Amino acid sequence: MSKRSLSSLGAEDLCGKRVLVRVDFNVPLGDEGLITDDTRIRAALPTINDLLDKSARVILSAHFGRPKGQVNETMRLTAVAQRLSELLGKTVVKTESCIGAEAKSKVDAMSNGDVVLLENVRFISGEEKNDTEFAKELASLAEVYVNDAFGAAHRAHASTEGVTKFLSPCVAGYLMEKELKYLQGAIDQPQSPLAAIVGGSKVSSKIGVLESLIDKCDKIIVGGGMIFTFYKARGLSVGNSLVEEDKLELASALEKKAQEKGVEFLLPTDVVLADNFSPDANSKLSKVDAISEGWMGLDIGSESVELFQNALKDCKTVIWNGPMGVFEFEKFANGTNAIANTLAELSAQGCCTIIGGGDSVAAVEKAGLAKKMSHISTGGGASLELLEGKVLPGVSALDDA
């Protein structure tokens, strides 16, 4: 699905134009109300700076938290406006509401190269309902639309989908374009062999991804808590490990489907067991067919790491979504860290490594390896849905290339 990008618009198209840019500024805040990680704000800078270079009037729209359609003083974008001003080296004017007379007057007062940040769009109930009247009023502030919020592209909300009916052209920003290039590209036209590493605690949250990837991958590597549902489906004893009893048949069906398609479907051969779920639990290594009663698996073992490393050796594209174990506990982070290091080494050898959102991004960042990967996705749910082969409303609403 090829979409028109901001790069197709020159200064002659944008000079003096009011451009509504949907960004993803849903950043973490600390106790003092200060931003603890500004990655998402920085990720939007290429798009914002390009518009400023082309003398546009930049109107930014963003959500923060889940205020449920009401004003929540702790969810205002004040800290974001301040940080963005520092990063851009210029004043960013923030509105008190994203629509209404005050927002309109601040937009009307803009000169070329100015930046206005509209207040949290989710303060208005019409945002998440994709209300046409709200979308129309939001769109009336601008003439051109740019969506650079990949992390919100799986939502059909007023600021991601509704506004496109009232603005033209509607194009993808540079972050959105990069996300689609890597994630969509890896699925539609991968350099093969293509491997997917799927982790996380529950099969249920990754069913769609696994089903979709079995059709596209040469190899699938499964780790994290969900492995125990597969083991139990095979008739193995899993002790106190996490199991989704209602997904046993599905686990068997997924393995069978992979086998029928000739896809290498790899599960760990050994696991690190713990006697309780805590960072200082007693631990021991065990083969998967000898898991002790009363113990639970919290990481993959060293033999499994080697098995997975060998399987990945010849791959040209690797997508990773979900950790191998409870990496938040140092004792059970080895499997996840080993995979992160392996992918960093593969990247250096020319393999395209894509970290597909969520906890695996946190794991790679914690290991200090983020810069060594080909692409780190900024979208959690959006990445997952794209990997599932779903159409993202915020993307399909943009102009075709």
From Swiss-Prot:
Where in the cell is the protein located? Cytoplasm
The record's keywords, sorted A to Z, are: ATP-binding, Cytoplasm, Glycolysis, Kinase, Nucleotide-binding, Transferase
A single GO BP term for this record reads: gluconeogenesis
Q: What is its main location?
A: cytoplasm
Q: What is its EC number?
A: 2.7.2.3
Q: Which residues bind substrate?
A: 24-26, 40, 63-66, 122, 155
Q: Which residues form a coiled coil?
A: none
Protein family membership: Belongs to the phosphoglycerate kinase family.
The name of this protein is Phosphoglycerate kinase
Gene name per UniProt: pgk
